[in-house]
Amino acid sequence: MLKTIALDAMGGDHGPKVIVPAALSILKKHPKVKLTLVGKEDQLALLIPEKNRKSFGQRLEIIHASEEVGMDEPPSQALRTKKNSSMRVAINLVKEGQAHACVSAGNTGALMATARYVLKTLPGIDRPAIIAAFPTKNEREVRVLDLGANVDSTPENLYQFAVMGSILSSAAHNIRNPRIGLLNVGEEEIKGNELVKKANELFETRKTINYIGYVEGNTIFNNIADVVVCDGFVGNAVLKASEGVAQLIKQHAKEAFSEAWWTKLALLPAIPILKRLIRRVDPERYNGATFLGLNGIVVKSHGSANIKAFVCAVEEAIFQVDKNIPQLIKEEVAHILKEFENK
């Protein structure tokens, strides 16, 4: 059976110019995937070579959507007035069972508002959270949530985020009990604001996750936790700062190789090492944040993503379809709620 992914082809800073070539790349790489491009049909058709149309056949589909959501458009306005936007139509395909997942590089707020309105949250989940993978000092990734869906959260919200993050991490790394850390300004019990302290008490009381305690910002990438939980305000700051540092490393590496020829000659032995370093911290490789907790799979690509980065976002969606992440969360949450009822 083909896995069908709906792509909001008009979303992001570059729209179809990035998304269509990325789609063609995915279809070449994943023979059991079907992609549905949602957007302005005349624009999309022009970007697909005839040879690709013939070779991919039914695995490449275009569904016309007459509207698109602007990157700066207020979420409430997009939800209310853009019912035939490429974003809305792509999410509707997931709701109607015509697609297994949706990927968009569009307006984050509008995507979250629309996805939550159309798909609703899973039973037992109050709010969805944004989760993404980050590199660590070894090959295993750490997943951090919430990265900006909820600026104001409750301890119960953070606990639900931890449960969902644990399920996704377990599926991604084939580990039984992922280590869950709570992001704080220190490891001592007395440190942190009221939200973090109360969440810590809740995490310790409920034995349903492998909670290891507080994690500080400078140890997120040290492989001491598989999942790091925080509210959306803090998480978004972590995300943006991490992306900035990664871009800085790439920029300095490029500048080093643009120096005089004798500098380049001296750096020759280090080229393989530098390439590995740049690859490991490259934000493009980790592009694709998931709106976790919805009754369907929605993956958000960075708005400025290039072809390579958008491919990574689509592959994250394919992975979650393979593992049926929403169903795993639904089953685990139901099991936890039943345990609480029996106590």
Swiss-Prot record:
Check the record and name the InterPro entries matching this protein: FA_synthesis, Phospholipid_synth_PlsX-like
Where does this polypeptide localize?
Answer: Cytoplasm
**Class in the EC hierarchy, top level:** transferase
Which keywords belong to this entry?
Answer: Cytoplasm, Lipid biosynthesis, Lipid metabolism, Phospholipid biosynthesis, Phospholipid metabolism, Transferase
User: Which GO CC annotations does the UniProt entry carry?
Assistant: cytoplasm
Pathway in which the depicted protein is active: Lipid metabolism; phospholipid metabolism
Q: What's the domain of life for this entry?
A: Bacteria
Catalytic activity as recorded in UniProt: a fatty acyl-[ACP] + phosphate = an acyl phosphate + holo-[ACP]
Q: Which GO terms describe its biological process?
A: fatty acid biosynthetic process; phospholipid biosynthetic process
Q: Name one Pfam family in it.
A: FA_synthesis
Gene Ontology MF terms in the entry: phosphate:acyl-[acyl carrier protein] acyltransferase activity
Q: What is its EC number?
A: 2.3.1.274
- Assembly information from the UniProt record: Homodimer. Probably interacts with PlsY.
Provide the family line: Belongs to the PlsX family.
**Protein's job:** Catalyzes the reversible formation of acyl-phosphate (acyl-PO(4)) from acyl-[acyl-carrier-protein] (acyl-ACP). This enzyme utilizes acyl-ACP as fatty acyl donor, but not acyl-CoA.
Q: HAMAP family recorded for this chain?
A: PlsX
From the Swiss-Prot or TrEMBL record, give the protein name. Phosphate acyltransferase
**From which organism does this entry originate?**
Coxiella burnetii (strain CbuG_Q212) (Coxiella burnetii (strain Q212))
Q: What is the lineage of its organism?
A: Bacteria, Pseudomonadati, Pseudomonadota, Gammaproteobacteria, Legionellales
